[in-house]
Amino acid sequence: MSKLKLISPAVPNVPWQDKPEGHTGAPVWRYSENPIIGRNPVEGVARIFNSAVMPYGDEFIGVFRGEQVNGIPYIYLGRSKDAIHWDFDKNKIQFVDEEGKPFMPIYAYDPRLVKVEDTYYIIWCQDFYGAAIGIAKTTDFKTFVRIENPFLPFNRNAVLFPRKVHGNFMMLSRPSDSGHTPFGDIFVSESPDMVYWGKHRHVMGKSSEWWESLKIGGGAAPIETSEGWLLFYHGVSGTCNGYVYSIGGAILDIDNPSIVKYRCENFLLTPEEWYEERGFVPNVCFPCATIHDSESGKIAIYYGAADSYVGLAFTTIDEVVDYIKEHSVVTTSDTEEGR
């Protein structure tokens, strides 16, 4: 039983593998059978990566970034009995507008999947006169209705909170430019209806730590805990041979997520294995989802690896929160409301 409380439903069949003997460093360890999704997983799809999964009934469901053989990314639906071995629909998700008419994005990538009350929301990056945030909703994973674009371009890495805060939906995002953005901070915005968004607040920016000195962006949906919102995010460093994407951790205030309570100065996971270092885009660990069990405190982290694979890692709520707090370094802009 965890000493900290995960405020979420129990998921007794959360995928899990015990920490390897002799493991050192941050308390996040890889699944020994990684990657869980390899190349050419579906006819016409070269790679699946940067994808989001969650419990659905007694099994699991997910939305997956499928890079087609023509290079265009779309979102595919997948199902699994154990959240490790996945079966994918052969065709990409067919979106409609609120009148039921076909309404497909030009492209769609890096989806997140979050349930708020009785509705599942898919959030992704799309083309809206440049890179922008797209949102769709479903209640049955059969009909996917696109709703209004929340923000102007350019924006990426949007992540919806799993419940309303003070009666409003809350969403993290990372304003950007139209290309491979060499900058970026995390902001939070709120909405009464998932249409009109405002009260934009700065959450946190890049830091002086080398692993996240270029830019940062939201990752998996924040996890509600008795200590605050646990956020796994990505941090990027620039090297003479390109960018390196690592996974970081922070804890946001439960009532005002623009305030950072703790922020780990060390990365939690950085590219080290072949499937993280070698691929279409080398040196990438990009978190997009977690599955967590409130009874045991177990957390499974799903991340894109080298823009080519899906990796799985594990931690526990007690270990990761203790580590973040023990190695926390926050700035004035982190701890103040960013307005």
Residue ranges of each PLM-predicted region?
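Beta-rich carbohydrate-recognition and catalytic domains
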Residues: M1-I106, V114-L214, I223-N283, S294-K298, ...
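C-terminal substrate/ligand-recognition segments
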Residues: C288, H292
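Catalytic core of Fe(II)/2-oxoglutarate
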Residues: A220
